[in-house]
Structures are given as structure tokens and as C-alpha cells.
Design a protein with these regions (language model features):
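Short, structured beta-strand/loop micro-motifs enriched in basic residues and often containing a Trp
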Residues: 1-9
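A broadly conserved detector of short glycine/acidic/proline-rich loop/turn motifs that flank catalytic sites
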Residues: 9, 29, 64-66, 158, ...
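C-terminal binding/interaction regions
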Residues: 25, 133-186
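Feature captures the catalytic cores and cofactor-binding loops of soluble hydro-lyases/lyases
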Residues: 31-32, 36-159
Length: 186
């Protein structure tokens, strides 16, 4: 099913999304990769606040290239999500609900998604220039020393994504693999 949604990703909205849905996302998202996630989780462990309010937030696993003159951002394709798996349950426990990336997730992340009504969106790897066209504003908000991995606040319009894992733990990757194997056996 095709859905056009406006953030923030509330629990109610998350529960309307199902593995396999095509989603066009509009609203504010945040960028972070493994170094940024590590730093945020360290801050949380010390009782410190995060650089943004994580409640109902969606985090895009991306390290964008520098913007060319006249552009908001450079190429902004997804990075492999597995590198954030050690941190994703902690981020969801403080309110983050959406994650955008590519690739499979560990069972612990899927369990956290079920517990906290999280959604994992897949973005097309190799389509960073196309995805960058959906980004209308970009603002560096923290950890500038991390370069491309610094935290940014982005405003996106109609960002094309697929729900890979929904809040019930349904997993498009696993469903697709099972369907393929079933056909192969016939």
C-alpha cells in the first residue's frame, strides 16, 4: 500500500504502517551513524540530554557528502543499518521511533521495535543524489567533529521509502526470502 505521511512518527501512526508499504515521508528527521549513536548513548548513560528531543523522532542512517554551491546537501544515501544495532534499542527506549537505512537488523532490534512501536524504513542504496532532492533544509546540530557523521536536522518532502520492519515485527526481508524459497521448491 502507498502512504504519504507527515512526521512526527507517533505510536498511533507507526501502528498504521505495515511491512511492504511504500511510504513518502514529509517532516523533520535527524541524521546519525555509528559514531553519533555511540556518543548519544554515552550521553544518556551519564544522564545527559541528547542534542534533539528523541520523542517520536525518525533517525536517518546517513553520512551526507558536502553540499555543492546552491544545494542544501550533497549526496545522501543510506548506510548499512547493522552498525547501529548495538544502539538502536537504547534510542528507542528514550522515544525514537523511526529508523531509515539499508540492510537487515538483529533480532534484538526487532524486539525493541515491537516493545516501543518502532518502524524501520528502507531507503535505496546507491540513490543518494535522488534522495538528496527530497531534503529541503539541513542544519548541523551536534558533534561537528564527526564530519559526515555529525548530527543534522533535515526537513524532507515526499522521501520515498519502504517499510521493511513494522511495529509488530513483520519483516519484509524475511517474508520475501520465504516467498522465494517456497516458489523455488515447487
Amino acid at each position: 500500500m502507498e502512504k504519504h505521511i507527515t512526521l512526527p512518527l507517533t505510536e498511533e501512526l507507526a501502528k498504521t504502517l505495515h511491512a511492504g508499504d511504500t511510504v513518502y515521508l514529509t517532516g523533520t528527521i535527524y541524521t546519525s551513524r555509528d559514531a553519533g549513536h555511540k556518543r548519544m548513548c554515552e550521553a544518556l548513560a551519564k544522564g545527559e540530554e541528547l542534542p534533539f528531543d528523541p520523542k517520536n523522532a525518525t533517525i536517518y542512517y546517513v553520512g551526507p557528502t558536502p553540499a555543492k554551491p546552491g544545494h542544501v546537501i550533497g549526496s545522501a544515501g543510506p548506510t548499512t543499518s547493522g552498525r547501529m544495532d548495538a544502539y538502536a534499542p537504547t534510542m528507542m527506549s528514550v522515544g525514537a521511533r523511526g529508523m531509515i537505512g539499508k540492510g537487515a537488523r538483529l533480532p534484538e532490534v526487532v524486539e525493541a521495535m515491537k516493545k516501543y512501536s518502532g518502524v524501520y524504513f528502507g531507503a535505496i542504496g546507491g540513490a543518494g543524489a535522488l534522495l538528496a532532492k527530497c531534503i529541503k533544509k539541513a542544519e548541523l546540530i551536534a558533534y561537528e567533529d564527526l564530519g559526515a557523521e555529525a548530527l543534522r536536522r533535515l526537513y524532507v518532502e515526499e522521501m520515498p521509502l519502504v517499510v521493511v520492519i513494522d511495529s509488530e515485527g513483520n519483516n519484509l526481508y524475511e517474508e520475501g526470502r520465504a516467498a522465494y524459497l517456497q516458489k523455488k521448491e515447487k
